[in-house]
Amino acid sequence: KIMTFSNLCNEIFWKSTTDYHVTDSVDAPMNNPYELKTIEYYLYLKNWIDAVQWHFEDIIRDPQIDPVEALALKRRIDKSNQDRTDLVELIDSYFLDKYKEVKPLSDATINTESPAWAIDRLSILALKIYHMQQEVERTDTTEEHRAQCQAKLNILLEQRKDLSTAIEQLLADIEAGRKYMKVYKQMKMYNDPALNPVLYAKK
């Protein structure tokens, strides 16, 4: 099997997802096995952040959660969202650098999303697939529940296959100059004191 970029992503995302679930703790330290500042390192980190955030969202949905804990958790979710966005931008900068010598064709078009935002969705899919697989493998549920989850799992696997193909097509188009990358800085307003009214009112 040729190691395409999407294959690399899926492999690393799956490793990170399964590594996270060894402890299944939002406070567990991350042991990133890849060399610092490599694209592999950032892909592993990306999925780890997504896995932690997935479980933050589970915890905060608990109706019995203590309000003080909920507020502290909300702040951690905000920080996690910011980290996630920063990392997506960093992954896009990898592609911008990789394809900087490519001259777009005169009729080149722009894609609706940058490569890294598509890769972001691929990372979330790894988590969805993992959790759906857990449901399929449960022995304390009905056969009907397992069958429903298996049907959902099949759709998620098909979605991952299609999204991986679309990412490969996009990267091939960028490389050939048929498409060009344009990255807009994501303005995450809730963390920026200059942009969030509640924060700048406190100055």
Give residue ranges: language-model regions.
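Anionic, Ser/Thr-rich low-complexity intrinsically disordered regions
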Residues: I2-K203
